[in-house]
Structures are given as structure tokens and as C-alpha cells.
A protein has these predicted regions:
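Hydrolase catalytic cores
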Residues: 1, 13-19, 92, 136-191
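Subtilisin-like serine protease catalytic core
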Residues: 1-27, 43-46, 74, 98-101, ...
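Active-site-adjacent substrate-recognition loops and nearby beta-strands
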Residues: 29, 56-60, 81-100, 106-129, ...
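Solvent-exposed, polar/charged alpha-helical surfaces in well-ordered, non-transmembrane soluble domains
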Residues: 31-34, 67-71, 103, 160-167, ...
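Short acidic, glycine-rich surface-loop motifs adjacent to enzyme active sites
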Residues: 33-60, 82
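Sec/Tat-exported extracytoplasmic proteins
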Residues: 40, 52, 56, 73, ...
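Short, Asp-centered acidic motifs that coordinate Mg2+ and/or phosphate
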Residues: 47, 78-80, 103
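Catalytic-core regions built around general acid/base machinery
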Residues: 61-79
Length: 191
């Protein structure tokens, strides 16, 4: 293997919500969250990484998505979501990252500055978001062709890095709650 992620020893469980063009529907994300919830114990799922966000979503649909991720959070999952790439304007964090409960990740560039496209808060409910930023520029990631890679940028690249760090944290202390994980991450960030 040429490349490996932040937590190369962790087991991944994938729930596909996008087609080969990168398009998806709200119903597919909601169905995936239900599947994860149902299979939590079978696969030992602790972390839900959601590297998609929806800017062009009506408020009713956004509320359904936020409700679903908050239900997952309330079940004890560590839910990590992308802030979206609609920044840098205030209030540009996309759903479900606008949820006050979940860990919302913005993107930083090669110079450790917040990326110009990274979603920014506060949310419509005056919640400070994102909770943290992680490298999201020029990341080598998998591509949609067999055994191929591509260089990508954005919060969809920074979010899995945080999820990987959380996997390592939970490996060290498996009894941490999602709230404790979020608190530890926020307290360890440099401003």
C-alpha cells in the first residue's frame, strides 16, 4: 500500500450515500444513519464520519438531517461532520455540521490558515462552528477508479483526519464518551 491514513489499524465500515458522480440524496444519508445505528454492536462502530454537507437544502430537509445526526450523538456515537466548502462568509457551515452537538471540522491550508472555502460560523442558532480545523489542502485520497488516487481539497478531506485522530484517542481510552472526546479535541486546539 502506498498511502495510509491517520489510524491505519482501525476497521472501517462504509455506508455508501453518494453515486459515482458524487451526488446524493437526503434519504440515502438518513438510511445510512439508521443502518449504522442498527449495526453498531455487530461491527463495534463508535465514530460516524460524514464528509458531506448540503448547502442547497431547504430548512425542513436540513432539520431532518440535523435531527438524525443528533439522535446518533445521543446514542453515544462520536459524530464528525464536514463544515462544508461554502466559506468564508459567516453562517456558511452546511448541514449537518451546523448541529450544536456534533464535532464539525473545517479545513486548513498548507500554511495552517483556515482555508478560504471552509465553512464558518456562527450558525443561525449562534453556535460557534466549526469546532476545529484540520489539514484539508492537496490531500492524497482515493479516487473513483480501481486502485487509484487523486489530490483533493476541502472539508471532506479534513474531516476523516479528525475521525482518525479520534479512533486513536478511543484506542487509548475506550471509555471516553462523545462529549469527552469533543471537549478534549477543542481544548487541545491551537488558536
Amino acid at each position: 500500500r502506498r498511502y495510509q491514513g491517520v489510524a491505519p489499524g482501525c476497521h472501517l465500515v462504509a455506508a455508501k450515500v453518494l453515486d459515482r458522480r458524487g451526488n446524493g440524496r437526503l434519504q440515502d444519508v438518513l438510511r445510512a444513519l439508521q443502518w449504522i445505528s442498527f449495526n453498531q454492536n455487530l461491527y463495534g462502530i463508535r465514530i460516524i464520519n460524514i464528509s458531506v454537507g448540503a448547502a442547497a437544502m431547504d430548512s425542513k430537509a436540513a432539520a431532518r438531517l440535523i435531527k438524525a445526526v443528533e439522535q446518533a450523538w445521543d446514542q453515544g456515537f462520536v459524530v464528525v461532520t464536514a463544515a462544508g466548502n461554502m466559506g468564508p462568509a459567516y453562517g456558511s457551515v452546511t448541514a449537518p455540521g451546523s448541529s450544536k452537538k456534533v464535532i464539525t471540522v473545517g479545513a486548513s491550508d498548507m500554511l495552517d490558515r483556515i482555508s478560504s472555502v471552509s465553512g464558518a460560523g456562527p450558525t443561525a442558532e449562534c453556535v460557534c462552528k466549526p469546532d476545529l480545523v484540520a489539514p484539508g489542502a492537496d490531500v492524497i485520497s482515493c479516487a473513483n477508479k480501481r486502485n487509484s488516487y487523486a489530490i483533493k481539497s476541502g472539508t471532506s478531506m479534513s474531516t476523516p483526519r479528525v475521525s482518525g485522530a479520534i479512533a486513536l484517542l478511543l484506542q487509548k481510552d475506550p471509555f471516553l464518551t462523545n462529549v469527552e472526546v469533543k471537549m478534549l479535541l477543542r481544548e487541545s486546539c491551537l488558536d
